[in-house]
Amino acid sequence: MEGVLYKWTNYLSGWQPRWFLLCGGILSYYDSPEDAWKGCKGSIQMAVCEIQVHSVDNTRMDLIIPGEQYFYLKARSVAERQRWLVALGSAKACLTDSRTQKEKEFAENTENLKTKMSELRLYCDLLVQQVDKTKEVTTTGVSNSEEGIDVGTLLKSTCNTFLKTLEECMQIANAAFTSELLYRTPPGSPQLAMLKSSKMKHPIIPIHNSLERQMELNSCENGSLHMEINDGEEILMKNKSSLYLKPEIDCSISSEENTDDNITVQGEIMKEEGEDNLGNHDSSLAQPASDSSSSPPESHWEEGQEIIPTFFSTMNTSFSDIELLEDSGIPTEAFLASCYAVVPVLDKLGPTVFAPVKMDLVGNIKKVNQKYITNKEEFTTLQKIVLHEVEADVAQVRNSATEALLWLKRGLKFLKGFLTEVKNGEKDIQTALNNAYGKTLRQHHGWVVRGVFALALRAAPSYEDFVAALTIKEGDHQKAAFSVGMQRDLSLYLPAMEKQLAILDTLYEVHGLESDEVV
C-alpha cells in the first residue's frame, strides 16, 4: 500500500505531508513519489512496532517501538486511516505468524538436539566405566578370557552406539540450523565484512545516473539502499552523486523529527533535505577521495612481480588495521568488526560441519557488542568493558561480556593456530585443524564436544579446495604469486592478531578471570 500521510516533524514545522510505502513488512516514507530515487527518509519494521489509535483524533495513528522509534501520523480522512490500519495490521500479523512458526521449529529442533546430547553424555559415562572394567580384567591375566571377551564386546557395542548417536546429532544440526537463522548477521552485531576492491573505512556505492539509481531501487526491499548495522540500525546518507554507507553511527534525531521529549533514537535516523535541522549529529559523513568500482580487485605488477589479492588483503576490517589506544587499549568497535571479518574462514572450511563453531564465535561477538552499545562513550576499549564488570562484580556471571570475550579470544586463538599451521607449510587441513585444536580449545572441552569436533574433521576440505576458497578471482590459487601473497598477508595479519590476544591474556591473568571450566 502507498499514499500520502501527514507526519509530525517538530514544533516549528508541525505536520508535514509525506509519501509512505508499505512493502515487505517495512513502512518507509519519502518527500514525494518523484523523490523516491533519493532513498527513503525513514522507515519502521512493522513486526516489532506497536500500532496505537489516538483516543481523540480519529484521523491519527501512532507507530511506536518503545524507547527507540516513534512515528506520529495523520490521514486525510477517517476512511483513509482505516485503510492504513488494516494494511499495517495485516502486515504485522503476517510477519508475526511467520516469525512465530520459525521460532517454534527452531525450539523443537533445539530440544531434539538437547535430548541427543543427553544420550551422548550417558554413553560417554558408560564408556568410561567399561574402559575401567576392561583395565581390571586385563590386570587379572588371561585366566578369565571369557570375561575379557564379554567386556570387549560390550565396549565395542557402546562405542558403536556412541558414534551413531553423535552422527544423529550432526544430522539434526545440519538439517535444522543451516537456515538464515544461522548465516545471517545477528542484530546488534557489526556488519559481516565483505570483500572490497580496496580497504576503505567507509564503503562507497557509486550511482552515476538516474537509470542506475532506478536499478538500485528495484533491487531493494523497501525502495532504498540500506545495510544492516548494530542494533538493527539502517542509516542512509545522501549526496547528489553517491550514497555513503557508514556503520556504527550514533545520532540524535534531527529537530524536525523530535517530539517535545527530544527523544534520542538508536534505530533508523534520516536527515531530511530542505527542512530545518536543529538537532546535533554525533558523526559526519566521510567524503571519499575518488569513486571506487564495486568489481573484485585485480592482480597488478610491482617491481616486476605480480601481486595477487587474497581473502586477507581484501578484508574490510583487519586486526592489522587496528591502532591501539592509550595504555594498549584495544578499540572495541574495530576489534569486533575484525572478528566478524575472519568468521568466513569457517565457511570456507565447511559451512555445515563447522556451523557449531561459527555459532559460538558469532554468539560471543554479539554478547560483547550488546554490552558495548549500552554505553559506547564509556566502553571505547575492551579493557574498559572488562574492568567495568570486574568493579560491578559481574565479570564471572554467566553470559557476561567478560565471559563472552574469554571464549571469543579462545576461538580466535584456534583460528590463529590453524592459519599459522597453513602459513608454516602444513598441506593437510585435517592435521592443521587438529594441531590447532589440541593447542587451544581441546583443554576446555569435554568428551562430547571433542567427539563433535573429531566428526567435523572428517569433512574438512582438501588443501587445494581451501586455498581456492581464499582467492578473489577464480584460478588465482594455481599461480605461484598467490602463495607468495598468502605468506605476505598472513605475515601481517597473524602477528597483529597475536599481539591483541596477548594483551587480553595479560588482562585476564592480572584479574584472575581465566576459567578451567570444561564444556
Swiss-Prot record:
Residues 282-298 have a biased composition (Low complexity). It is a peripheral membrane protein. Gene3D superfamilies: Glycolipid transfer protein, Pleckstrin-homology domain (PH domain)/Phosphotyrosine-binding domain (PTB). Residues 1-93 form the PH domain. Coiled coil: none annotated. One of its GO terms (biological process) is ER to Golgi ceramide transport. The keyword Protein transport applies. The modification Phosphoserine is found at residue 145. One of its GO terms (molecular function) is identical protein binding. The keyword Transport applies. The modification Phosphothreonine is found at residues 139, 153. Homodimer. Interacts with ARF1; the interaction together with phosphatidylinositol 4-phosphate binding is required for FAPP2 GlcCer transfer ability. This is Pleckstrin homology domain-containing family A member 8. It comes from Canis lupus familiaris. The lineage of its organism: Eukaryota, Metazoa, Chordata, Craniata, Vertebrata. The gene is PLEKHA8.
